[in-house]
């Protein structure tokens, strides 16, 4: 059997073995780079990925810090702009300015601007206060008692002659209830035997004040323009026996505001003046003093 096969078997066997070896070598060669390359690639991919992430985070942190550093000066500049744009209040203006004593011109101009909105030109002329309507003004050196002694030299005589109820001889107008109490304390050396009444809205009803004015003779009243205006409107207080109207013009509160610097108080003061006080001043029966 072996002889019959002859050389062909061997040749075929030899030829058949060669390609198998070649195929195996080729497969081995093909397998080696496939196995080696992915391993190398995996290692190469893992290392740069980690480093790249670190570098990216570092770069991001750098950019964030740069952005924050760039934002800070912008915020500071915006704050400075806001500070610059802040408007001055009345308190800031008044504290920076020197106190100037009030004059008759101040009250006349205030009444003129008020009446120009609601009155005709002819009516405005009839409501204009002349210089003869005013007493000498406080030059910021007087206390209340010393000022009243100067402008009311015959106070003792006038006090005795006053017999009317629901009326006073001296009416002092100020901006608040606390200031009212303070001024009443300052009247001790001036008032003598005169009866003093406080007129403000805090804890005291209008009806109670009307009763107290009608019961007996009151010589001096100190109060706020809002309550005095309400009493004049209800005729609980009249101007028949009134001779002196003193406005607490120059006093400044904790915020450096005068009575006419507070809008509500100023409005009440102007309304109060229209309740027969301007007319009495023009007739010469009442004199105005700016303390």
UniProtKB/Swiss-Prot annotation:
Ranges of compositional bias, category Basic and acidic residues: 58-79
Pfam family, any one: CMS1
Gene3D superfamilies (alphabetical): P-loop containing nucleotide triphosphate hydrolases
Region (Disordered): 1-96
Origin superkingdom: Eukaryota
Biased composition (Acidic residues): 17-27
PANTHER family cross-referenced by the UniProt entry: PROTEIN CMSS1
Family: Belongs to the CMS1 family.
Record protein name field: Protein CMSS1
Species annotation: Danio rerio (Zebrafish)
Organismal lineage: Eukaryota, Metazoa, Chordata, Craniata, Vertebrata
């Amino acid at each position: 059997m072996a002889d019959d096969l002859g050389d062909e078997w061997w040749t075929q066997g030899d030829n058949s073995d060669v390609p198998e070896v070649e195929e195996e070598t080729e497969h081995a060669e093909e397998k080696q780079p496939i196995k080696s390359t992915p391993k190398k690639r995996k290692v190469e991919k893992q290392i740069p990925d980690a480093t790249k992430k670190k570098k990216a985070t570092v770069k991001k942190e750098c950019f964030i810090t740069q952005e924050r550093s760039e934002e800070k000066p912008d915020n500071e500049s915006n704050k400075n702009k806001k500070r610059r744009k802040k408007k001055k209040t009345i308190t800031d203006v008044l504290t920076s300015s020197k106190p100037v004593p009030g004059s008759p011109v101040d009250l006349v101009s205030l009444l003129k601007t008020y009446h120009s909105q609601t009155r005709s030109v002819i009516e405005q002329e009839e409501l204009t206060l002349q210089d003869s309507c005013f007493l000498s003004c406080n030059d910021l050196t007087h206390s209340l008692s010393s000022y009243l002694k100067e402008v009311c030299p015959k106070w003792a005589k006038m006090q005795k002659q006053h017999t009317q109820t629901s009326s006073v001889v001296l009416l002092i107008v100020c901006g608040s209830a606390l200031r009212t109490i303070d001024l009443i304390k300052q009247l001790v050396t001036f008032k003598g035997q005169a009866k003093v009444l406080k007129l403000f809205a805090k804890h005291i009803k209008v009806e109670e004040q009307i009763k107290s004015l009608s019961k007996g003779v009151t010589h001096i009243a100190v109060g706020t323009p809002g309550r005095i205006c309400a009493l004049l409107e209800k005729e609980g207080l009249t101007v028949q026996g009134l001779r002196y109207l003193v406005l607490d013009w120059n006093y400044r509160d904790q915020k450096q505001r005068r009575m006419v610097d507070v809008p509500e108080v100023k409005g009440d003061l102007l309304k109060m003046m229209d309740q027969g006080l301007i007319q009495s001043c023009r007739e010469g029966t009442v004199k105005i003093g700016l303390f």
